[in-house]
Amino acid sequence: MLNINDINKRIKQRPPFQMIERVIDWTPGESATGIKNVCINEPYFMGHFPDAPIMPGVLIIESCAQLCSLVFDTEGGNPDIIYVLLKVDNFKFVKPVIPGDQLVITVTKTKIMGPLAVFDAVVKVNDEIRSKGTMTFTMVEKSKIYG
């Protein structure tokens, strides 16, 4: 549904920190399902852990966050707005993610409270849940951060 070029028009992250490579389902303002292919060439595997590489949990959360920002962005990639992760709740890592896995990440908006949006996230590999949790975001104008 969205390829890497389409995604680049809507989210701020870029390689090597861009985690979402393809979006296979997307309802703007509501939900999305995206793909992250986990490759042994990712720089973090050099140190986490060399003898038994595992994708760091914080990067799994970041993958979910990037997909949430795509859902939250209903303005079509406004260059003056940054979507900021404020809070992570009850994120559980059920089984490790290793090189060769393909993450299928689904995020669903569950609540809007003024400028805040709450999302549920589920990460699967081969239809098996690897992690899940809840995330809260807000929109911030770049000028309020950088002047």
Residue ranges of model-derived segments:
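Short aromatic-glycine motifs in intrinsically disordered, low-complexity regions
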Residues: L2-R14
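Active-site helix/loop of acyl-thioester processing domains in fatty-acid/polyketide metabolism
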Residues: V23, M55-N78
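HotDog/MaoC-like acyl-thioester-processing domains
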Residues: G29, I98-D101, T108-G147
